[in-house]
Amino acid sequence: GVLYRWRQRSERWRLELLKERIRRDGKVKGTDVLKVDSFLNHQMDVELFAEIGKEFKRRFAGCEINKILTIEASGIGIACVVAQYFHCPVIFAKKTQTKNIAGEVYTSKVESFTHGRVYDIIVAKEFLGPGDKVLLIDDFLANGAALEGLAQLVKDAGAELVGAGIVIEKAFQPGGDRLRAKGLRIEALARVQSMNEETGVTFADD
């Protein structure tokens, strides 16, 4: 009854808080660039991150999770705050362009559409292995290359991939649909349907 309605209200409030912040402080460039560096991935609003963490905890409440995996650099801040609600450590995959990578790491390739280059991401084998139940966390999902690279590391480690928590998904780009079609559970808090410099951001559930 009352408690259920209160919970529903607090859940909606968290999502509205995030969407309102994107509308207010996000800067749209063209039709596909959304800059949220004033609160998400350069300067970070940790109180907002806490609400995001609570929402991911709610969505993955029934899941056993003992590791959170993200990618450097912009995923680290959000992953650390989220991890407090799951009471587990955070691992961040390191980007490297070194050719001679030691054998004590899992490695995967990621194509950066922003920078137009391919790089390797690595995680030390001592931190990820069979028996681990992993939640991926990242700030953005667009083409899905980073998420795919992280998922490959989990697979190579023989660990279980529980799902992915994404703060902002560009729903008009193919990554989310492609990865969901492969069976990955993706929980995206704000799904952007379209954007332009005049009208700003339109969300998928508006």
Predicted features along the sequence, with ranges:
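Conserved acidic residues
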Residues: 66, 132, 162
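Active-site-facing substrate-recognition patch
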Residues: 4-65
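Short, glycine/charge-rich flexible loops or terminal/linker lids adjacent to PRPP-binding catalytic cores
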Residues: 88-134, 200-205
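PRPP-dependent phosphoribosyltransferase catalytic core
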Residues: 4-14, 20-21, 32, 151-206
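Active-site/ligand-binding-proximal alpha/beta "capping" segment
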Residues: 130, 138-156
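Short Gly/Thr/Asp-enriched flexible loops that form oxyanion-binding sites at enzyme active sites
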Residues: 77-86
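Short glycine-rich phosphate-binding loop at a beta-alpha junction
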Residues: 65-72
